[in-house]
C-alpha cells in the first residue's frame, strides 16, 4: 500500500512540473524588439518558437532540456533573430506574473555578449 501511495505521489508531481514547463507555450510580445512570437511544441515534442510576421524560427530547444522547479525555468535553447550576427544560448524563466524572462549569452570572435528579453503573453 505504501509503495502504491509513493508511486501515485511521484506521478502527480511529474504532471505538475510538466504543466509548469508548458506555461511557456502561447503567443507573446517581446518588449525590447516589438515582435509578436509564438512558442509551441513541434511534431517531435520539442519546444520551438517562430516570429508570427514571417514564420522565421527564432527559438530551438537544445538536446537535453531541463526544468528547474526551484527557479521555475527551462534550459537550454538556441535563440537567433534574422538581424543578429550570431545566436544565443539562453534559458527561460517563468515569472510569478506569468510573463517570461529570457537571459543568455552569445560568443563571437571579439568577446561574449549577454542578452535579456521580456515577453508578455498576448490574448
Report each predicted region and the residues it spans:
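Sec-dependent N-terminal signal peptides
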Residues: 4-16
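Small side chains
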Residues: 14, 49, 104-106
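Central antiparallel beta-sheet cores of small beta-barrel/beta-sandwich binding domains
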Residues: 23-89
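Non-catalytic surface loops within mature trypsin-like serine protease
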Residues: 53, 94-96, 123
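Predominantly extracellular/luminal cell-surface or secreted proteins
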Residues: 52, 105-107, 122
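N-terminal helix-cap/turn-to-beta initiation motif at the start of protein domains
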Residues: 16-27, 116-123
Amino acid at each position: 500500500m505504501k509503495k502504491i501511495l509513493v508511486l501515485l505521489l511521484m506521478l502527480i508531481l511529474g504532471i505538475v512540473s510538466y504543466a509548469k514547463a508548458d506555461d511557456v507555450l502561447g503567443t507573446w510580445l517581446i518588449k525590447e524588439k516589438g515582435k509578436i512570437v509564438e512558442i509551441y511544441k513541434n511534431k517531435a515534442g520539442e519546444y520551438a518558437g517562430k516570429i508570427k510576421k514571417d514564420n522565421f524560427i527564432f527559438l530551438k530547444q537544445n538536446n537535453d532540456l531541463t526544468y528547474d522547479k526551484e527557479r521555475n525555468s527551462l534550459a537550454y535553447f538556441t535563440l537567433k533573430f534574422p538581424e543578429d550576427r550570431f545566436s544565443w544560448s539562453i534559458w527561460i524563466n517563468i515569472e510569478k506574473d506569468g510573463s517570461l524572462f529570457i537571459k543568455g549569452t552569445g560568443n563571437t570572435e571579439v568577446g561574449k555578449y549577454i542578452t535579456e528579453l521580456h515577453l508578455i503573453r498576448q490574448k
